[in-house]
């Protein structure tokens, strides 16, 4: 008989408390973990199942787990899954929240028409950097439509809705916030729910691409049935990874949480309704990097093989991935330059290039240029074995060319070549100028 697993599966408030108070780094200890890795929070979930490239790195004191941030940073790097009320526009709601929280900026993940209610992801301060990534995510709606004439059978309505799936031509309605030009939008599924012949009204569920007008789908439904139709009511069930069944808050919750924080210094309500920005990235493939290279990435450096600790399965070239720290903080969204099998087999090269940096600069200390290769390179420049730009010259030893791997891209090499070409062109221009001057002198004579 094997040893019994002492780790218990926690649920509800107990799980939330354990995630907030627990330490999810791996210190050397004989104690059993309180939580199974499948219950670790946010980007650290199933951390033990990631592919390991190396376990050797120096942990830094800077940085903190997303759930343990102080309340100011917790709010500025968080978002709401807001239940938008009917009548005010999305921009009005977002500006009200900005005024309530007294934050620098707010944004949202896709406009809802004034009369439409439901999921609206409201991003605060630093999280606005992720608003674009959520705007392109899929949306799900529940719609009530009304037909202008009677329909003999419910099945006709169901068949007509099934026809309105796939890539559809749409022109925005007469009253809309965008230019009325023909465009293609994809409807993934139209699920018929109910139809009442007496009221000539029905309900259906629509899963579609962002930017799809459900109002236009209702008009097209009426055209297919030959009786005309219109949308009566609409609610968004899901926006990206957030749906109405999970952590949805109202405007009153935001007001109450801010009131408690201001008057009684009680953070619990605010921490309950605000979610860390890492929750928006849980569907992305992950790459974990060393603490020493985090600040370099924040300054725009590429993600190289020596800086990687762990990485996910099924990473594909050209796809978006999230670069994270060992504490579970999101550093940036990057475009993968290698797949999983390549990362496992090579010893140098560019793994990914950053697309959108999320973490602020200088949260972690500057550690670039302190490694053994960089230190040796600096010394060689000082001794004159390399030129002032760190490139080989006549005195450079041959062993250096074999040891040192240049990771600069082709574009950078081309840029370096262009000045020589310009120098060659310069004498030609001068000669042309001199000829002109001679001709002008002859004219004046």
Curated annotation (Swiss-Prot):
Active-site residues, Swiss-Prot/TrEMBL: 113 (nucleophile)
Amino acid composition bias (Polar residues), ranges on this chain: 20-32
A GO CC term attached to the entry: box H/ACA snoRNP complex
Highest taxon of source: Eukaryota
PROSITE patterns per UniProt: PUA
UniProt entry tagged with the keyword rRNA processing: yes
GO biological process assignments: box H/ACA sno(s)RNA 3'-end processing; mRNA pseudouridine synthesis; rRNA pseudouridine synthesis; snRNA pseudouridine synthesis
Pfam family, one: DKCLD
Main location as per UniProt: nucleus
Documented EC number(s): 5.4.99.-
MF terms (GO), sorted A to Z: pseudouridine synthase activity; RNA binding
Cellular compartment(s): Nucleus, Nucleolus
Keyword hit for Nucleus: yes
Broad class of enzyme this protein falls into: isomerase
SMART domains xref list: DKCLD, PUA
Gene3D superfamilies registered for this protein in UniProt: Pseudouridine synthase, PUA domain
Subunit structure: Component of the small nucleolar ribonucleoprotein particle containing H/ACA-type snoRNAs (H/ACA snoRNPs).
Protein family (similarity comment): Belongs to the pseudouridine synthase TruB family.
Record function comment: Plays a central role in ribosomal RNA processing. Probable catalytic subunit of H/ACA small nucleolar ribonucleoprotein (H/ACA snoRNP) complex, which catalyzes pseudouridylation of rRNA. This involves the isomerization of uridine such that the ribose is subsequently attached to C5, instead of the normal N1. Pseudouridine ('psi') residues may serve to stabilize the conformation of rRNAs.
Protein name as catalogued: Putative H/ACA ribonucleoprotein complex subunit 4
Gene designation: dkc-1
């Amino acid at each position: 008989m094997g040893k019994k697993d002492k780790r218990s599966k926690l649920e509800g408030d107990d799980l939330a408390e354990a995630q907030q108070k627990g330490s999810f780094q791996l210190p050397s200890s004989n104690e059993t973990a309180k939580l199974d890795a499948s219950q670790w929070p946010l980007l650290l979930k199933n951390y033990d199942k990631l592919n390991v490239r190396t376990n050797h790195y120096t942990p830094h004191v800077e940085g903190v787990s997303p759930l343990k941030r102080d309340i100011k940073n917790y709010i500025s790097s968080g978002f709401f899954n807001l239940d938008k009320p009917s009548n005010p526009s999305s921009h009005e709601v977002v500006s009200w929240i900005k005024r309530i929280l007294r934050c620098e900026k707010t944004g949202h993940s896709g406009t809802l028409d004034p009369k439409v209610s439901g999921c609206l992801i409201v991003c605060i301060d630093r999280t606005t950097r992720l608003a674009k990534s959520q705007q392109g995510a899929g949306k799900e709606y529940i719609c009530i439509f009304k037909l202008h004439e009677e329909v003999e059978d419910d099945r006709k309505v169901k068949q007509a809705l099934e026809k309105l799936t796939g890539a559809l031509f749409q022109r925005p309605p007469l009253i809309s916030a965008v230019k009325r030009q023909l465009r293609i939008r994809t409807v993934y599924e139209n699920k018929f729910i109910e139809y009442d012949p007496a009221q000539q009204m029905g309900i259906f569920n629509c899963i579609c691409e962002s930017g799809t007008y459900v109002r236009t789908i209702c008009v097209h439904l009426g055209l297919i049935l030959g009786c005309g139709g219109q949308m009566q009511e609409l609610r968004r069930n899901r926006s990206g990874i957030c749906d109405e069944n999970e952590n949805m808050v109202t405007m009153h919750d935001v007001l109450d949480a801010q009131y408690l924080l201001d008057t009684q210094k009680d953070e619990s309500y605010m921490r309950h309704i605000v979610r860390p920005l890492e929750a928006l990235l849980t569907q992305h493939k992950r790459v974990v990097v060393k603490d020493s290279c985090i600040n370099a990435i924040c300054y725009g450096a590429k993600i190289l093989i020596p800086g990687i600790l762990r990485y996910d399965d099924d990473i594909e070239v050209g796809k978006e991935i999230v670069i994270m720290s060992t504490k579970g903080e999101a550093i940036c969204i990057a475009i993968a330059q290698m797949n999983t099998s390549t990362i496992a087999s090579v010893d140098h090269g560019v793994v990914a290039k950053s697309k959108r940096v999320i973490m602020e600069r200088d949260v972690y200390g500057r550690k670039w240029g302190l490694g053994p290769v960089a230190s040796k390179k600096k010394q060689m420049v000082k001794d004159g074995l390399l030129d002032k730009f760190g490139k080989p010259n006549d005195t450079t030893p041959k062993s250096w060319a074999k040891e040192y791997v240049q990771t600069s891209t082709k574009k950078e090499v081309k840029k370096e070549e262009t000045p020589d070409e310009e120098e060659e062109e310069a004498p030609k221009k001068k000669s042309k100028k001199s000829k002109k001057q001679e001709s002008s002198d002859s004219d004046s004579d």
